[in-house]
């Protein structure tokens, strides 16, 4: 495998169809919504935040955004961004998860 940056994000309870991944200018943006499940009753402790979120992750190396891939399994998002041989021109690329938008 060529050298790559690997980004792993914990996203428990997030529907992968509600995730958007964008790589541009040495930044990976992970955005989406964690919806509150229909729960009833009283809770002593709730450790999940709900609602829209966005994370901007700086990338240490220039990456080949066109060859990026992502996998979402059991609440864990793994993004693989191959390191570019030379600095690419700045472009914004939407990364699909497991072949789905």
Sequence positions of predicted segments:
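Alpha-crystallin/small heat shock protein
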Residues: 1-101
